[in-house]
Amino acid sequence: EGQVLLAQEVASDSLASYSFYEKAHGFYLLFNSDVNSSGTYTADTVGSFIDSVVYSFYESQQKPVYLGLNAPSFATTDMSGSDHSESIISSTNVAYNSYNVDLESQTEFYIAYLNAISSRGWVSGIASRGFFPAMQMADFSSSIYGKPAFDLFHNQ
């Protein structure tokens, strides 16, 4: 028999807890980068957040916790420079692909999370969300395959 994990987005300073959580075998907590806050992710700030919010949730549930990390390689969310804002987030928009890709901010997000999580043995696992194994990409997507952030997982 397999395990049933419940997924829950982590978007605030607390994680909801419901009575049906007792039926789950563990939790898959979803972390998304905030492109408006790029450069603010450090192992210390992430570690403090994980210790205060995620560890409290872990203690209350006493079940395995897995973290799903998602960080697109956007440079900014500013769409004012585009005449076609309705299609700005499109792999076919060549102008968007060429000026709004920031592989470094994606890598910094993963560095901060991996460094913070590596010393916390109560975290059962880490996953990179949005991974696209069919092709190495250097675009704005969340996939780390073919990008500098991919190498971080090989060095752990």
What are these regions (language model features)?
Residues 19, 77-112, 116-156:
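Aromatic-rich peripheral "rim/lid" segments of glycoside hydrolase catalytic domains that contact
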Residues 56-57:
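Alpha-helix-loop-beta-strand connector modules within alpha/beta enzyme cores
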Residues 2-4, 8-47, 60-95:
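Aromatic- and acid-rich polysaccharide-binding/catalytic face
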Residues 50:
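Conserved phosphate/ATP/ADP-binding segment of small-molecule kinases
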